[in-house]
Regions:
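Short, acidic/polar
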Residues: 28-36
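Short, structured loop/turn "capping" segments at alpha-beta junctions
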Residues: 39-47
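Charged catalytic cores and adjacent phosphate/nucleic-acid-binding surfaces used
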Residues: 59-162
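Structural alpha-helical scaffold elements that stabilize or flank donor/cofactor-binding regions
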Residues: 4, 36-39
Length: 162
């Protein structure tokens, strides 16, 4: 499996947020995500769709994914059209966001638009973070209407029931 993403370097650079509002910074991130997907086809699953929220000033305070629903839809439709999946990453729980990345709205919208390829990750860069909060994933996905998750073998998706 190859995961595409907008690098975390963009989000955490000291100067990224200088001279821009939280809304501008978040929108620029989503625009960069869309540009990456338009240009690159060398991945199977796109991760970190709303990763920017983790590094935004005051994280989720005064943030609503619905403010970005149009560009989120563009991103999801393009991924689906190109046969790409998304990752449900539980690191949001580890970092105090209280939701996975992307949050439930995006997972549900991906499913509503016809997306089927969905992997589960945890940003387990340390052994103790491997599969972090995976016990929460089935209920989250089921609440979004999703009944399957995806694993890959030789870059071929295999759907498994929750």
């Amino acid at each position: 499996i190859l995961i595409g993403l907008v690098g975390s370097e963009m989000c955490i650079r000291d100067r990224y947020w200088e001279g821009k509002s939280k809304q501008q910074g978040i929108m620029e991130y989503y625009e960069a995500t869309l540009a990456n997907i338009r240009k690159l086809d060398c991945f199977d699953v796109y991760g970190h769709i709303d990763y920017i929220v983790r590094y935004a000033p005051n994280q989720r305070e005064n943030y609503s994914i619905l403010d970005y629903k149009d560009i989120i839809d563009e991103i999801l439709k393009l991924l689906i059209q190109n046969g790409k999946g998304i990752e449900c990453n539980t690191a949001g729980f580890k970092y105090g966001l209280g939701v996975p990345n992307p949050e439930n709205y995006v997972l549900k919208r991906y499913h509503e638009l016809g997306g089927e390829i969905l992997t589960i990750g945890s940003d387990g860069h340390k052994p103790e973070h491997t599969a972090y909060a995976f016990d929460k994933v089935p209920a989250i996905l089921e609440s979004c209407g999703i009944r399957y998750y995806t694993v890959f073998h030789d870059r071929k998706p295999i759907m498994l029931p929750l």
